């Protein structure tokens, strides 16, 4: 019995309300229920028709004036105690989620939970929310992995209706799945090596040995490396495009767009260099050429095709725009506040480099992100105190959303690994067709046929299993040995 029920004794003039909750019957005073008119039982007493009553309870007996509720009777004892005492108490053995649903059904607010149980209730509720979030994230990751795997299977099925479907299928799998076979791994390693060689050549080309007053010097070796890399990139993109099962989906893939963007600067620069004009636009074209050459750095994004981590990072940033927005908002507020504070205490000092609020913006940015280049710094005591506060606030502000983003990155990284494993497991049956096939049953049948034929050739007939004696068994063994020896000699 819950505390509060034992001490309550209704008066003789008070009208009782008969309640039946899952077989637990209790008669309660109307005045007790009307203390909380916004709850379900309080609203029940204000109903003027049977239809309105049945909207609040599961059944109603007119003869007995009994209201029936198909709810948990053990939890209703705590609800009933609330009407007597005005406070909710949560026992240690109760399920927080079930208790929350129960009081929500009866229309009781969580604010009525007594202070002795409120902290424990909120802590356990937050723990359940965190577990649910982790489970939902894992389920979403698993479901999306299965969805992408099923899409991969559908893409493979499209090749059956295409021209040169089998050839295009083999090429497409080897280009898209480096773990498929040895040739696919060699293609992936070659593509990765070409990307790195192109980036190294671009960086070496910017060194002072390859510069003069007029601009860059065309080194034949670096130019040859550049042409070879572009030829590889162009051929790779053309092969992918030719083998793709759907051209429209091909151009919707971000990795394919990156491949296309990485080769545009070379051909655009080549077109600008071959154009002969004797006007003032030549100088502008030279600037365009320099910009296009700098765009070659986008080739490094091609590494995402061969890196699970880079693909996971892109998916994390794409699905964490809310957390990234919060991070930028926190930093913006902190930068605005501390830049004005540092400017107000440093502006009167002639030795300070913080002479304007825009400069203070830069100082606050590198301070809150704990970079601290040292090009601008406060010189007064008040400025140093503000700088210390700025750095501490920056550490706290940056750390809050980063944890959530890191957890999402872990989930998406595991998701990408699951997708790769699923694709490898789906490709395994196709690899098995290339291996030699042996059927043990057929081999056994062939051996038995050879054995019976050898018995027939020497005139031995087995008529009755019970008539077999030791001498016949020895003869059979000699025949078997002779037959196996002849088979080995024939082989």
Swiss-Prot record:
Keyword terms: Cell membrane, Ion channel, Ion transport, Membrane, Potassium, Potassium channel, Potassium transport, Transmembrane, Transmembrane helix, Transport, Voltage-gated channel
SMART domains on file: BTB
GO molecular function: delayed rectifier potassium channel activity; potassium channel regulator activity
Motif Selectivity filter: chain residues: 370-375
Predominant location category: membrane
Intramembrane stretches (start-end): 358-369, 370-377
Tissue: Detected in whole normal term placental and placental chorionic plate arteries and veins. Detected in syncytiotrophoblast and in blood vessel endothelium within intermediate villi and chorionic plate (at protein level). Detected in most tissues, but not in peripheral blood lymphocytes. The highest levels of expression are in lung.
GO cellular component terms given for this protein: cytosol; Golgi apparatus; membrane; plasma membrane; voltage-gated potassium channel complex
Cytoplasmic side, ranges: 1-182, 244-254, 307-321, 414-491
Record membrane topology: Multi-pass membrane protein
Extracellular side stretches: 205-220, 276-285, 344-357, 378-384
Cell compartment(s), UniProt: Cell membrane
Family recorded in the similarity comment: Belongs to the potassium channel family. S (TC 1.A.1.2) subfamily. Kv9.3/KCNS3 sub-subfamily.
Function in brief: Potassium channel regulatory subunit that modulates the delayed rectifier potassium channel activity of KCNB1 by namely slowing down the deactivation and inactivation time constants. While it does not form functional channel on its own, it can form functional heterotetrameric channels with KCNB1.
Subunit structure, interactors included: Heterotetramer with KCNB1. Does not form homomultimers.
Domain notes: The transmembrane segment S4 functions as a voltage-sensor and is characterized by a series of positively charged amino acids at every third position. Channel opening and closing is effected by a conformation change that affects the position and orientation of the voltage-sensor paddle formed by S3 and S4 within the membrane. A transmembrane electric field that is positive inside would push the positively charged S4 segment outwards, thereby opening the pore, while a field that is negative inside would pull the S4 segment inwards and close the pore.
Protein name per UniProt: Delayed-rectifier potassium channel regulatory subunit KCNS3
């Amino acid at each position: 019995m819950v505390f509060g029920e034992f001490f309550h004794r209704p008066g003789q003039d008070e009208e009782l309300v008969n309640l039946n909750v899952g077989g637990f019957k209790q008669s309660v005073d109307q005045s007790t229920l009307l203390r909380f008119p916004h709850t379900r039982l309080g609203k029940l007493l204000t109903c003027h028709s049977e239809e309105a009553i049945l909207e609040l309870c599961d059944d109603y007996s007119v003869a007995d004036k009994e209201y029936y509720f198909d709810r948990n009777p053990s939890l209703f004892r705590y609800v009933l105690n609330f009407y007597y005492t005005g406070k909710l108490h949560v026992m240690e053995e109760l399920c927080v989620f079930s208790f929350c649903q129960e009081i929500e059904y009866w229309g009781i607010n969580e604010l009525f939970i007594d202070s002795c149980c409120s902290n424990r209730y909120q802590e356990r509720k937050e723990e359940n929310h965190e577990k649910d979030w982790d489970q939902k994230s894992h389920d979403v990751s698993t479901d999306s992995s299965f969805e992408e795997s099923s899409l991969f299977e559908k893409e493979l099925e499209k090749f059956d209706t295409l021209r040169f479907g089998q050839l295009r299928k083999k090429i497409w799998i080897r280009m898209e799945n480096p773990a498929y076979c040895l040739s696919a791994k060699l293609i992936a390693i070659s593509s990765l090596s070409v990307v790195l060689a192109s980036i190294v050549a671009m960086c070496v080309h910017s060194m002072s040995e390859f510069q003069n007053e007029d601009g860059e010097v065309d080194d034949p070796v670096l130019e040859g490396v550049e042409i070879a890399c572009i030829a590889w990139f162009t051929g790779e993109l053309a092969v992918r495009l030719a083998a793709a099962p759907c051209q429209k989906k091909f151009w919707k893939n971000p990795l394919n767009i990156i491949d296309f963007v990485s080769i545009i600067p070379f051909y655009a620069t080549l077109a600008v260099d071959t154009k002969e004009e004797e006007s003032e636009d030549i100088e502008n074209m030279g600037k365009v050429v320099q910009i296009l050459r700098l765009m070659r750095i986008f080739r490094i994004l091609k590494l995402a095709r061969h890196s699970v981590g880079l693909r996971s990072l892109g998916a994390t940033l794409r699905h964490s725009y809310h957390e990234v927005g919060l991070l930028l908002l926190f930093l913006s507020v902190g930068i605005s506040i501390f830049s004005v504070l540092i400017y107000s205490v440093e502006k009167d000092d002639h030795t300070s480099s913080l002479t304007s609020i825009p400069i203070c913006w830069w100082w606050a940015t590198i301070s809150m992100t704990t970079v601290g280049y040292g090009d601008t710094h406060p010189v007064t005591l008040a400025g140093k105190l503000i700088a210390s506060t700025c750095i501490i606030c920056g550490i706290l502000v940056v750390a809050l959303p980063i944890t959530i983003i890191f957890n999402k990155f872990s989930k998406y990284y595991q998701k990408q690994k699951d997708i790769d494993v699923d694709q490898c497991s789906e490709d395994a049956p196709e690899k098995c067709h290339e291996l030699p096939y042996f059927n043990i049953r057929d081999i056994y049948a062939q051996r038995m046929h050879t054995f019976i034929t050898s018995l027939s050739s020497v005139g031995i007939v087995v008529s009755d299993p019970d008539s077999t004696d030791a001498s016949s068994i020895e003869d059979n063994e000699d025949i078997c040995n002779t037959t196996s020896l002849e088979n080995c000699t024939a082989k």
